[in-house]
Amino acid sequence: MRKILVIGAGAMGAAFTFPLVDNNHKVTLTEPYNKDFQNKLLKKNKFHPTLKLKLSKRVSIKKFSSELLDEKWDLIVVAVSSIGIEMVRQYLKNIKKKISILVLTKGLKYDQINKKIITMSEQLNKGNQNLNVSVLKGPCLAKELANKIKSYTVIANQNINIAKNIGKLISTKYYKTEYSSDVKGVEFSSAIKNIYSMIIGSGEGENTASALFRKSLDEMEYLIKYFRGKKETVHGLAGVGDLYVSAVGGRNSKMGEYLGKGYTFKIA
């Protein structure tokens, strides 16, 4: 049994508690960005409105605070939106002891100081060398994970053994993990696929969408190589895997469909 904190009580953060509980870990869920939402979870007996089901009785829901972060955790999972990553960083930078962090958040940010695009793990790592940050990406819809439908993701860390150790903590019969040392490739693939899923969704029909899917992979390879990732990572779970699930059933694909029909971005 390990003591694991999940930061972010949205759909993915909440869904991620299921494999953790099934591995008999002591799991705490906290919401730093939307405290009203966390209160509603408690009032409704842990019923999650997005997942449409109750969280396990074994999941403890606590108020987000510096004191909570200062407790001894075997793993901290960051599952906030990309907007909330800076807020979490401000708290994590004060942690004095070595701690393993697993980032579920997908996205990129422009670093105004260094004038370059950085990943969520790079943003989170600023100012604290005690954080050992791994990232988890791949084709995993929160509702399917919560309903224990077989899902596969990839954990990336420059030290592949650290990624494998985290995988042992979270893997179940329905939730499988692969491993990669290409952190850049995994994070950039997972982030830019959102753009391409919109492009694919804008296609007039299946023929067009299929062609756009193929062309999207070509461009993703080029971009991943440009950002110093490995282009073969594009053909893994964080690339083609995540692109597929987003293009078939994701919100970005639906957005692309409306844009393709002529709606403005605001209306779509």
Q: Residue locations for each model-derived region?
A:
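NAD(P)+-binding Rossmann beta1-loop-alpha1 motif at the extreme N-terminus of oxidoreductases
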Residues: 1-55, 59-63, 121
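NAD(P)-dependent Rossmann-like dehydrogenase/reductase catalytic/cofactor-binding core
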Residues: 193, 200, 225-268
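Internal alpha-helical scaffold of NAD(P)-dependent oxidoreductase catalytic cores
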Residues: 91, 126-132, 150-233
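Conserved active-site and cofactor/substrate-binding residues in soluble primary-metabolism enzymes
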Residues: 7, 11, 15, 83, ...
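Buried hydrophobic positions in well-ordered alpha/beta secondary-structure cores of metabolic enzymes
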Residues: 12, 41-42, 76, 105, ...
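Rossmann-like NAD(P)(H) cofactor-binding subdomain of soluble oxidoreductases
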Residues: 58-66, 70-148, 166
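Hydrophobic anchor at the start of a short beta-strand
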Residues: 4, 25-27, 99, 131-133, ...
